[in-house]
């Protein structure tokens, strides 16, 4: 299946905290740019002035009183603004959009982990994206225990990361469930290997979906990362 301009150039990268998806998003953006694509790289929550302010509220460790429904609606507000201001216009202009987290994270964190009604979360996601859905989602597959070992070196955790191992286990199970439910869109990638090996699998999936990334661009992206 090949990408169609303005419709299928939206790729999201997902996984538990510490899975390495942000590194892979950065590498993929570089490789695509070197291959000649116009790329818009984003993260959630964030990506616009309004969305970044909401991000600060969501991740502030001091906001321990935040209720689950409040949290859900803040994520959706940040997402709605990002889609309206950046994602939809970029896709309409024929650009490739890469987003580090999107609505699958909301499903896993707020429905599977926090226990909010999944249909309510699905409806909220659909309201926020207004028909703008990712064509390909790469889930970086690593257990919460393995991810925790990586994150130990990162220092202080944000409010979401500090919710504990049982919470992260439910998030992990959520991503596994989504991958099983939507195998055409959602692809699991073993994130326990080296950065280079994981990136090779990432590129393999993106190529299979229709974006041409020459091996020279892959090598150059990895070389830049190592500098």
Predicted regions and their residues:
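Walker A (P-loop) phosphate-binding loop of P-loop NTPases
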Residues: 18
